[in-house]
């Protein structure tokens, strides 16, 4: 099977940013298998790779992306763990993620879970700063409720492009999907 390019992969658009519809979630992958599977997924046409600090596999994901030779065609998403959302911790952790991934930029940086102990305005301020400084192309959230989506979109100085949530026929998320649509975000 020949590889497809990112521009030919089916995508959704949020606020001018195109996100491949199908992505490889790496939450259960570890070690050499993670690197090999990531590389092979890209070679057969996957153009979105999803990882997170909590998965403890950013190094292997980055290895697989680089080994594919197709970095410019692949969107890499990573997520900041909730215990690292305070401004100093967040900035340091994003730089550590980039170092582990060994990439020049993160394509999409998400807050993995909200942390009620850290003011959202502070977290989003640092995420916007990381975008302005070129550490990430876009920012978004994961596992946010409708009320948190409303608050985040009200206070963020940068557009939030998505709320990554579990969504399938056995888990109705219509209210969150509706809130995302209202704010021009994708799920």
Q: Model-found features: residue ranges?
A:
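Acidic (Asp/Glu)-rich catalytic clusters
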Residues: 13-16, 40-43, 62-73, 95-104, ...
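N-terminal binding-site loop/beta-alpha segment at the start of enzyme catalytic domains
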Residues: 1-74
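Beta/alpha (TIM)-barrel catalytic core signal, keyed to glycine-rich beta->alpha loops juxtaposed to Asp/Glu
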Residues: 114-187
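Conserved, mostly hydrophobic/aromatic
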Residues: 24, 41, 49, 61, ...
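Structural motif corresponding to the early beta-alpha repeats
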Residues: 75-92, 101, 110-113
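Short, acidic/polar
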Residues: 29-42, 85-102, 122, 147-151, ...
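Active-site beta-loop-alpha junctions enriched in small/polar residues
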Residues: 27-29, 52-54, 79-83, 111-114, ...
């Amino acid at each position: 099977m020949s590889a497809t390019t990112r521009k030919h992969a089916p995508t959704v658009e949020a606020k001018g940013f195109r996100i491949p519809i199908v992505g490889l979630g790496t939450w259960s992958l570890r070690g050499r298998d993670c690197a090999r599977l990531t590389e092979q997924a890209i070679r057969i046409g996957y153009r979105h790779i999803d990882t997170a600090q909590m998965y403890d596999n950013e190094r292997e994901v980055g290895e697989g992306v680089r080994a594919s030779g197709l970095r410019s065609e692949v969107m890499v998403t990573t997520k900041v763990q909730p215990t690292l959302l305070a401004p100093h911790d967040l900035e340091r952790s994003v730089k550590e993620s980039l170092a582990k991934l060994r990439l020049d930029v993160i394509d999409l940086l998400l807050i993995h879970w909200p942390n009620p102990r850290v003011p959202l305005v502070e977290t989003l301020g640092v995420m916007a700063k990381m975008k302005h400084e070129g550490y990430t192309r876009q920012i978004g959230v994961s596992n946010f409720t409708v009320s948190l989506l409303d608050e985040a979109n009200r206070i963020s100085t940068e557009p939030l492009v998505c709320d990554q949530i579990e969504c399938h026929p056995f888990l109705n998320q219509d209210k969150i999907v509706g809130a995302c649509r209202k704010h021009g975000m994708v799920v």
